[in-house]
Amino acid sequence: VFFDEDATYGKSWGVADYLDYTDTPLIVAAVECNAGANNERLVEYSPYRFDDKQYGHFDGKGKDTLNWFVHEFKPCIDANYRTQPDRAHTFIGGSSMGGLMSLYALLEYSDVFGRAAALSPSLWVAPEALTALVGRCKLAPGTVLYMDYGSREMGNHDGMRKGFGEMCSKIFARGINLTARVVPGGNHSEASWEKQLPFVFHTLMYELD
């Protein structure tokens, strides 16, 4: 997230440089995903069990991961840093599987997270379950979401575009303040996500006291 030398895949989002350059008054606390050879991150960052043609079956442990975020990680950050711990000032964001988790967190813990950024979220993991959650979740007023995907991502462009559009429509229908973008020339990479930071932080910080 912050520096290339510390990044799981060798390239960060350059968040530290961006926040310094723009003088954005924000505390960012980042966690490292499990980058094991057996794709453990797909387990820890999926709220649902799913099967993938390429990788096989995965028991989703994302609910456990999010429970740790809410009940251990966030309280630790709030206790040790000068945060504003209320939901209006508590954001969550990520890309790919982290984007899926960020969207899930915003829907499942609307009392904790007021705003979220889901870059290239892995909506393919469990679209039916996620759609059901969008329909039934209890949302607090003033919920804000940034969500995007790149026009050059993956192989099934038509399927991705259709799924992304349908999910955005359902989210918007729930009254969420949604900023949705198809990034021209964007792909599934940290370098591409870094370029979206101005749009991400503009959405997250918009009209925030």
Region roles according to the model:
Residues 1-209:
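Non-catalytic cap/lid and distal C-terminal segments of serine-dependent acyl enzymes
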